[in-house]
Regions:
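Class I SAM-dependent transferase core
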Residues: 1-73, 81-85, 89, 102-112, ...
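Conserved nucleotide-cofactor-binding alpha/beta core module
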Residues: 65-187
Length: 205
């Protein structure tokens, strides 16, 4: 999977590739989908949600510039696969998931990995996780019409925020990357077109 689906598509960061090799995707995939666990596509995990395709998990970690020792927040953590990969890269990870059914499944699974640097919490990601801020990187694993101000405020100076943005309510989105400068200014760039499940919670109001 790592060689054929990720490295050959341009992800060469050794930390990303090592983490993708270390974290077994099949344990996050429902039993009925085990034969597809290492296919490069998203798979349903219940509650209308999906586990992201392996390439996209690697891509998000790569463009966020995640390095060991960084403080990273993930919003829309779902089953916990992306969070586990980020933790395997050596980051201190704070993962948020609003769907109770998914959080209930993810918590014992992630505990079995015994990753002291991975913290998973059931909560509305639109408010972020202010107690652990600021974050060197913030990754949205769900699509939002815009990034809440409360989340931007939790991004550290020099940090990067990666989010699929769906401004027109269509099925497809564009991943945007913001970088916060020393003066607190946010520089934005558009990266690639994607398709993520929509963010829920206060962002819908």
């Amino acid at each position: 999977m790592v060689r054929d689906q990720i490295a050959r598509r341009g992800i060469t960061n050794p930390r990303v590739l090592a983490a993708m090799t270390t974290v077994p995707r099949h344990v996050f995939v429902p039993s009925a989908r085990q034969d597809e666990a290492y296919a490069d596509r998203p798979l349903p995990i219940g509650a209308g949600q999906t586990i992201s395709q392996p390439y996209m998990v690697a891509y998000m970690a790569d463009v966020a510039g995640v390095e060991p020792g960084m403080c990273v927040m993930e919003i829309g953590a779902g089953c916990g696969y992306q969070a586990a990969v980020l933790a395997a890269m050596g980051a201190e990870v704070f993962a948020l998931e609003i769907v109770h059914e998914l959080a209930e499944q993810a918590l014992p699974l992630l505990s079995s990995f015994e990753l002291a640097n991975l913290h998973y919490h059931e909560a509305d990601g639109s408010k972020g996780w202010p107690d652990a801020a600021p974050y060197d990187a913030i990754i949205f694993s769900c699509a939002a019409p815009s990034v809440p101000d409360a989340v931007f405020e939790q991004l550290a100076v020099g940090g990067r925020l990666i989010a699929p943005v769906n401004a027109d309510s269509g099925d497809h989105q564009t991943i945007h990357r913001w970088h916060k400068t020393a003066g607190g200014t946010l520089h934005q760039e558009k990266l690639i077109s994607v398709r993520f499940v929509p963010m829920t919670g206060a962002i819908e109001e």
